[in-house]
Amino acid sequence: MCAKMRRGALNQALLDRGLNKLALGHHYDDAVETLLMNLLFEGRIGCFQPVTYLDRMDVMQIRPLLYVEEKEVANAVNRLQLPTVENTCPADGGTRREEIKQLLQTLEKDYPGLRTKIFGAIRRYPLYGWDTETLQR
């Protein structure tokens, strides 16, 4: 299932159970990749927000893994033997995000610490929803 359909199904499952908070699995690398995707493919500086409120559904989406790198998440999944679900989206693996992931790997060889610098820029740049006040709520 593709991301938008999956998120819609998760939001509906929450509402069906009388819940209103959804923890999404976006991590550090997702934020860096999203910023670069927006910059390169849309010509804008932007990234998803750490906390998003969907007022039409009264659902709060949180991203508690934002400060955790993808490799750390993968290591924890393996170490704790957590079950995983295969992505059945037909575009999986052949996406713009995958292109950006490969680009970052290449750039990191010549510019060590690039991901850290980009993530730092996300935190310092006045992106909506990334300010300290919003994050403390």
Language model: regions and residue ranges:
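Active-site adenylate/phosphate-handling loop in enzymes that bind or generate adenylated species
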Residues: M1-E72, I118, L135
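Short glycine-rich, acidic/polar surface loops and turns
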Residues: E72-A74, N87
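The feature marks non-catalytic terminal segments
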Residues: L82-R137
